[in-house]
A protein has these predicted regions:
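Boundary at the C-terminal end of the N-terminal hydrophobic targeting segment
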Residues: 20-23
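N-terminal secretory signal peptides that target proteins for export/translocation
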Residues: 1-5
């Protein structure tokens, strides 16, 4: 234990010395470059997985007026980090706390032209991206970061992605979202109704009186196409008995934790069964994309969607909002 503490202290001393030697480089950039903190996007949630140092608190400033504070700590047994940076034009905050809590805020200062931005991620809640000053705010909500990037590509590319990629410059989030969308459009055409019918039968079987039947259904759902995860998350748990609820939650937890960093293939497979994703694609400018999305929504919902992808833009918008209300009621 003593040797471990000494080694950690030695690493920390080297790290802080490197910061001091490169004071013109922001602390967060240095931390990202040397990978002292491990960030990932898992199941569409931004996560601080771990750190290579213990508790640290560092302050830094330079001649140009930039001031920074970096605090890395243990929060209820989980890694946590707060980073604040201010200069003449803007202030920036990253706050990662235990329990999947993330808050990122960017605000202009003085004559700064930065658009105010806040990104909030809380446990078991939708992500919220808020843009604009207090008297003219626009808020976007989504089930995951990938939902948000697909539903609101331009605001995200312009305001959110550049800030998130300060944590991991190799993320290439806009490029990954484009690959997800491409795979979604290329991967349609299977018998969605038959697939969902099989899943529904297995979920029903999770409540069977015979243990062997319940175990067989459990194994089948775990081995199903990755898009089953989205289907399971949309279930109305109030309609399931206690055994079904217990098993479905365990399956969701297991499937959600299979990879530490989302890949385009995994994301596309997961989102392919989510009507809200296809509703977003139904609003794309490309006619072929709208037509594909319309067909997929009919298959997923099992009924006419009431949206004509060839209608004039105003009519399409009205019809999509009506469809959105129907989807949210389900």
């Amino acid at each position: 234990m003593w040797l471990h503490r000494m080694a950690t202290a030695g690493l920390l001393a080297v790290w802080l010395a490197a910061f001091c030697a490169q004071a013109q480089e922001p602390l967060l950039n240095q931390a990202a470059q040397h990978k002292w903190m491990q960030f990932s996007i898992a199941s569409g949630r931004v996560t601080l997985e771990g750190t290579r140092v213990g508790n640290i608190q560092s302050n830094n400033s330079n001649s140009s007026g930039r001031r920074e504070q970096l605090n890395v700590r243990n929060d209820n047994g989980e890694p946590a980090m707060t980073y604040e940076r201010t200069n003449a034009d803007e202030s920036l905050l990253f706050d990662f706390a235990s329990g999947d809590r993330v808050r990122i805020r960017r605000t202009p200062k003085g004559a700064g032209s930065v658009v105010p931005m806040e990104f909030v991620q809380l446990p078991n809640e939708k992500l919220v991206l808020t843009l604009g000053p207090a008297d003219h705010q626009q808020a976007y909500q989504a089930a995951s970061l990938w939902h948000l990037l697909i539903a609101q590509p331009q605001p995200c590319k312009q305001h959110l992605v550049p800030v998130l990629e300060m944590l991991r410059p190799d993320w290439k989030l806009a490029e990954t979202a484009a690959k997800v969308e491409q795979r979604l459009l290329q991967g349609v055409g299977g018998d969605v109704a038959a697939q969902r019918s099989r899943w529904a039968a297995w979920i029903e079987q999770l409540g069977n009186d015979r243990f062997a039947k319940r175990e067989a259904a459990d194994r089948a759902l775990r081995a199903a196409d990755p898009s089953v995860l989205s289907y399971l998350r949309q279930l109305e748990f109030g309609r399931l008995d206690a055994e079904q609820q217990f098993r479905v939650r365990r399956i969701i937890d297991a499937l959600s934790g299979q990879s530490s960093d989302d890949s385009p293939e995994q994301v596309a497979a997961t989102l392919s069964g989510d009507p809200t994703v296809w509703l977003a694609l139904l609003g794309r400018p490309e006619p072929s994309t709208r037509q594909t999305a319309a067909r997929q929504l009919v298959a997923l919902l099992g009924e006419p969607i009431g949206v004509d992808p060839a209608a004039d833009p105003a009519t399409q918008q009205t019809q999509r909002e009506q469809l959105r209300a129907r989807i949210e009621e389900k």
